[in-house]
Amino acid sequence: IRCFITPDITSKDCPNGHVCYTKTWCDAFCSIRGKRVDLGCAATCPTVKTGVDIQCCSTDDCDPFPTRKRP
C-alpha cells in the first residue's frame, strides 16, 4: 500500500498489512492556521484520543492532505 507521509506529503510504500491514516488536532494556533495534520501508515489504526480526529483507510494514496474549510 502507498500512503502520504508528513512532513513532505509525499506518497511512499508502506509494509504489507499496514493502513494509511490522517490524524488532525488543534493546538494553540488552531484558530489562525487550522488543525495540525499528521499523515502516515501504521500496522493498525491509531487509538483515538480526546480532541484528536483519526481516519484510516486501506487503498493506495487514500490519505491526502485535508483541505481547510473557508468561512
Swiss-Prot record:
Record's protein name: Long neurotoxin 3
Matching Gene3D superfamilies: CD59
UniProt key word Glycoprotein: no
Source organism, top-level taxon: Eukaryota
This protein's record includes keyword RNA-binding: no
Source organism: Naja naja
Disulphide connectivity of cysteines: C3-C20, C14-C41, C26-C30, C45-C56, C57-C62
Physiological role: Binds with high affinity to muscular (alpha-1/CHRNA1) and neuronal (alpha-7/CHRNA7) nicotinic acetylcholine receptor (nAChR) and inhibits acetylcholine from binding to the receptor, thereby impairing neuromuscular and neuronal transmission.
Tissue: Expressed by the venom gland.
Subcellular location: Secreted
UniProtKB keywords: Acetylcholine receptor inhibiting toxin, Disulfide bond, Ion channel impairing toxin, Neurotoxin, Postsynaptic neurotoxin, Secreted, Toxin
Entry's Gene Ontology cellular component terms: extracellular region
Family listed: Belongs to the three-finger toxin family. Long-chain subfamily. Type II alpha-neurotoxin sub-subfamily.
GO MF entries: acetylcholine receptor inhibitor activity; ion channel regulator activity; toxin activity
Pfam families according to UniProt: Toxin_cobra-type
